[in-house]
Structures are given as structure tokens and as C-alpha cells.
């Protein structure tokens, strides 16, 4: 009889790490523009609350340890309230940030952070 292998049961995402070129600039972007709050920080990293998950900004100039991926992030999708979509889009464009949509989907908003990481804003009930 073949014994079944243990299936690891994940329960959610704790945090996502983004390497950033300027930690202070990135903190201002995610806090001032996207409304995140600081969970905790050190000299070379800042963890931000995004709902119940965290986004960690790591200072790329201190990328001297070996734990880092060799691949790039495609994009990170952030949930928002449906009623604030148009206001959020206007605020992002007011900052001079180029936004992109998905053809045939006027409620899907893509843009880049200061380091070129792809971001998407969407709201619950919206199909990815």
C-alpha cells in the first residue's frame, strides 16, 4: 500500500518582500499614496500593513545576504473599496504616475511603484 504524502496546509500570505532602491521614497509611496501603515521597521527594512497582510520593503543597497530570488515579480494586486476606485485613479495620476487598464475592463487599474514593481488595484467581487 502506497502511503499518501503529507500535504502542507497554508492558511494565507504573511508578507511579500520587495527590494527597493530608496527605502524612504518607497515608504512615502506606500504610506502616503496607498494608505498603508508601518507594522515594524529597522535600518534596512520596513514592514507595512496592507489589510491583514504585510508588504516588506527591503533596502536593495544592503542586498548582501543570500536569501533573494533570481526572478522578478509580475505584479501585486491590492484590494480596495469599490466606491473609491475613481478617486484612487485620479490621485495616482495626479502624482504623475502612468496608469494602465485592461481592455474591456474599466475597473482594473495597473501602475508601477517608484522601483518599477507592477501594482494592480481592484475590489472584492471583481474577477481577476
Located regions from the model:
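Conserved short beta-strand elements that form part of the metal-binding/catalytic scaffold
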Residues: 37-70, 112, 118-125
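N-terminal beta-strand motif that seeds the catalytic metal site of vicinal oxygen chelate
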Residues: 1-24, 75-76, 127-128
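Amphipathic alpha-helical segments
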Residues: 22-37
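Vicinal oxygen chelate
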Residues: 1-7, 13-21, 49, 66-128, ...
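A generic local structural motif
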Residues: 2-5, 34, 62-65
Amino acid at each position: 500500500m502506497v502511503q499518501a504524502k503529507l500535504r502542507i496546509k497554508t492558511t494565507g500570505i504573511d508578507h511579500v518582500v520587495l527590494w527597493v532602491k530608496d527605502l524612504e521614497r518607497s515608504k512615502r509611496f506606500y504610506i502616503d499614496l496607498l494608505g498603508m501603515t508601518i507594522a515594524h521597521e529597522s535600518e534596512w527594512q520596513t514592514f507595512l500593513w496592507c489589510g491583514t497582510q504585510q508588504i516588506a520593503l527591503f533596502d536593495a543597497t544592503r542586498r548582501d545576504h543570500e536569501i533573494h530570488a533570481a526572478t522578478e515579480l509580475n505584479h501585486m494586486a491590492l484590494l480596495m473599496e469599490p466606491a473609491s476606485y475613481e478617486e484612487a485613479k485620479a490621485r495616482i495620476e495626479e502624482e504623475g504616475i502612468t496608469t494602465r487598464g485592461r481592455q474591456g475592463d474599466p475597473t482594473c487599474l495597473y501602475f508601477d511603484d517608484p522601483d518599477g514593481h507592477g501594482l494592480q488595484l481592484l475590489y472584492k467581487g471583481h474577477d481577476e
